Swiss-Prot record:
Alphabetical list of Gene3D superfamilies matching this protein: Ribosomal protein L33
Similarity-based family: Belongs to the bacterial ribosomal protein bL33 family.
Name the UniProt record assigns to this protein: Large ribosomal subunit protein bL33B
Gene name in the database record: rpmG2
GO terms, molecular function: structural constituent of ribosome
Amino acid sequence: MAREGLTLRCTDCKMENYITKKNKKTKPEKIEVKKHCHKCNKHTLHREKK
């Protein structure tokens, strides 16, 4: 299937906080979203883990 699971990692503390899915055929680029990090206790940029 084209839709695969992935992990979002905080760019500040490198903690893996969120698990999501994306369609790799329609969105081949890496995901970047601002989400709340529980360790940093603030909104930070989360990127797709390699």
